[in-house]
Design a protein with these regions (language model features):
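Short, acidic/small-residue loops that bind anionic groups at enzyme active sites
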Residues: 84-85, 173-191
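Soluble extracytoplasmic domains of inner/organellar membrane proteins
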Residues: 129-171, 176
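Long, charge-dense
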Residues: 84-86, 90-138
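Membrane-cytosol interface motif
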Residues: 35-52, 56
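C-terminal functional extensions of proteins
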Residues: 191-258
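Gly-rich Lys/Arg/Thr-decorated short loops/hinges at beta-loop-alpha junctions or inter-strand turns
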Residues: 22-30, 119-123, 186-188
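Hydrophobic alpha-helical transmembrane segments of small proteolipidic membrane proteins, enriched
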Residues: 1-38, 240-245
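Histidine-anchored nucleotide/phosphate-binding helix
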Residues: 71-89
Length: 258
């Protein structure tokens, strides 16, 4: 195994230590700083607006399979949205293009309403598989928006060309729309058609950012520290090779050249 060496073992030990350190620090109330993400801050405002208007909201967890990291991040956001909606006595409609996501989303939403003491507000028929085809999915979602008169739309997860097809009808209805995806090619379409957009790795940080749960928060900050270490090593390596040549002690220690 090419990378099974002492340097890799040391890196794993260092990164694991950083993450564990920040997790334990977060549990003691010193989780670290996370910069403000406007799109996530406006989720509560969107839920409150829909509640005041007495109209439901739509949450769409993307078109990726349930094991996709973007879908998993979206389901974390769904849990937060469902909890807030339950506390405010509002209704969340989940639409999806992936059948396997239906029972997972149903369990998340049901648990949120139950924990909020409002199990009567949960309706299994609000978790809807619409269509696997992109065009049919967009048409069916637009139909739900029109029939239900939704006031807030959340689009989080992995998206393909359907991103604009899904959000453009919502823009026409005047609903507040918040989107987030890790697919950079779809970001311009969300920016054009949504009120707020969560971009790239901000999606992965969403659950920790919204809930401030110590384990997730500490893990997120610890990973950022690890990235800083990697960046520092890369810069030091590049400088040392440029100034001292490929045979200098630092490069030899890192095992870049053999």
């Amino acid at each position: 195994m090419e990378h099974a060496n002492a340097q890799m073992l040391a890196a794993i030990a260092l990164f694991s230590s950083l993450i564990l350190w920040k997790i334990f620090a977060a549990r003691r109330g010193r989780g670290g700083y996370i910069r403000r993400i406007p799109g996530l801050n406006e989720i509560d405002e969107a839920i409150g607006r829909a509640t005041e208007m007495g109209r439901p909201m739509i949450f769409h967890p993307g078109v990726g399979e349930v094991q996709n990291v973007g879908t998993l991040a979206a389901l974390g956001v769904l849990g937060y949205v469902a909890r807030k909606a339950a506390q405010m006595g509002s209704r969340v409609i989940v639409t999806t293009a992936v059948p396997v996501v239906v029972p997972v989303a149903e369990d998340i939403v049901k648990q949120a309403y139950t924990q909020a003491g409002r199990p009567d507000l949960f309706h299994a028929e609000d978790i809807r598989f619409l269509a696997a085809s992109g065009d049919q999915l967009a048409l069916a979602t637009a139909n739900v928006m029109q029939q239900e008169g939704t006031a807030a739309h959340f689009f989080f997860g992995m998206y393909d060309y359907t991103s604009l097809l899904l959000t453009e009808p919502g823009q026409r209805t005047g609903a507040i729309q918040i989107a987030g995806t890790d697919q950079y090619f779809q970001v311009p379409f969300f920016i054009a058609s949504c009120d707020y957009t969560v971009i790239g790795e901000e999606l992965y940080a969403a659950s920790a950012y919204l809930t401030r749960e110590p384990t997730m928060l500490g893990s997120l900050v610890g990973q950022d520290y690890a990235k800083m270490v990697v960046l520092a090593v890369i810069l030091l390596g590049a400088l040392s090779v440029t100034l001292l040549g490929s045979q200098n002690p630092f490069v030899q220690l890192m095992g870049v050249y053999r």
